[in-house]
């Protein structure tokens, strides 16, 4: 009986020790490292919440450029202004925090304004939570005059990384939701010429010569899986096929290896970016970007061409997750 009790105690201790969350240093930079020893997965997150992220499976990276957060809007707008609640808001290029002449990637892609609020692990997962109080920063509010806060939790459980974002509207007006993320994936030890993209989407977003959405759509006629050797995309897709929980699954696969992005129901759009490699070089990456809306959604909604724009009411929150899962690596 004593031996059985001891084995039970050791078993529980082993489970509890499987997950680890720690703040440490990597080449002189402060990082948070999440570990799932049983699954062989390690996630590292740097202070900017952008390009300093990494996810390794059995020691091999499946990310090439971190998991940049694109907010308050994802990817491109058509003009140097946006519309919300029937009002036009021009950007001030002199502040230096908006790309021009095509505003892209929001205002926070490389921001160091995030504050860590929790780093913890238990028998079920390891996680880190960070917060950014947008309303505190005049240069941000000058470009996007909606008082709000972001909270992002990266949670590692069962070898799967969940990225959960919560937007809290602390202002007096409804705030449009057009955010997204820009993760770029890779299949270790396999050339992109051998990858297939599995994209269960019925509809493709039509764009102009600046890759800005026009408000038009067309049927997705691309093969599924799509051979990336012969296709380079910078394209949004919608009407995603979803499982019983409302989740959409998009993945790259080759040689028995798979890297999968899973979108929660409020991520209506998948933007696929797999640019051609420069002459004489390789570029083994494919971005599968979860987006709450198509590019230029703010202005297309005002023009009556995109009625599906989400918003968060004063005092309310908007929450959604996406997940990253790998197999065969």
Language model region names:
Residues 1-7:
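Sec-dependent signal peptide recognition
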Residues 8-16:
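Hydrophobic h-region of N-terminal signal peptides that target proteins for export
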Residues 17-96, 244-268, 276, 316-327:
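Beta-strand-rich N-terminal accessory domains
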Residues 18-26, 92-158:
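Extended, loop-rich substrate-binding clefts of extracytoplasmic carbohydrate-active enzymes
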Residues 34-36, 43-48, 132-188:
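Acidic, contiguous internal or C-terminal segments within carbohydrate-active enzymes
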Residues 83-88, 117-128, 155-160, 189-193, ...:
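A short, structured loop/turn motif at beta-sheet edges
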Residues 174-176, 184-266:
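Active-site/ligand-binding surface loops and adjacent short beta/alpha elements
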Residues 259-329:
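Active-site pocket scaffolds in enzymes
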């Amino acid at each position: 009986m004593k031996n059985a009790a001891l084995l039970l105690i050791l078993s529980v201790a082993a489970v509890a020790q499987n997950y680890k969350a720690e703040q440490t240093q990597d080449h002189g930079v402060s990082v948070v490292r999440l570990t799932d020893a049983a699954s062989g997965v390690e996630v590292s997150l740097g202070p900017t919440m952008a390009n300093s992220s990494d996810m390794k499976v059995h020691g091999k990276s499946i990310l090439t450029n971190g998991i940049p957060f694109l907010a308050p809007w994802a990817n491109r707008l058509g003009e140097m202004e946006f519309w919300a609640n029937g009002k036009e808001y021009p950007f001030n290029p002199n502040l230096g925090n908006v790309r021009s002449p095509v505003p892209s990637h929001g205002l926070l892609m490389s921001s160091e304004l995030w504050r860590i609020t929790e780093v913890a692990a238990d028998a079920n997962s390891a996680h880190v939570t960070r917060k950014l109080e947008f309303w505190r920063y005049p240069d941000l509010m000058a470009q996007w005059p909606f008082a709000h806060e972001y909270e992002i939790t990266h949670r590692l459980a069962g070898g799967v990384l969940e990225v959960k974002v919560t937007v809290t509207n602390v202002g007096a007006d409804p705030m449009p939701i057009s955010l997204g993320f820009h993760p770029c994936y890779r299949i270790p030890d396999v050339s992109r010429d051998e990858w297939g993209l599995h994209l269960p989407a019925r509809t493709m977003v039509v764009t102009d010569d600046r890759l800005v959405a026009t408000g038009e759509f067309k049927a997705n006629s691309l093969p599924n899986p799509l051979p990336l050797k012969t296709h380079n995309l910078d394209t949004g897709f919608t009407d995603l096929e979803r499982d019983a929980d409302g989740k959409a699954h998009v993945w790259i696969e080759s040689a028995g290896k798979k890297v999968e992005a899973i979108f929660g129901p409020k991520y209506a759009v998948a933007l696929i970016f797999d640019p051609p490699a420069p002459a004489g070089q390789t570029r083994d990456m494919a971005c599968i970007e979860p987006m709450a809306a198509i590019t230029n959604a703010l202005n297309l909604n005002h023009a009556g061409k995109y009625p599906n724009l989400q918003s968060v009411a004063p005092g309310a929150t908007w929450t959604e997750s996406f997940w990253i899962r790998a197999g065969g690596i």
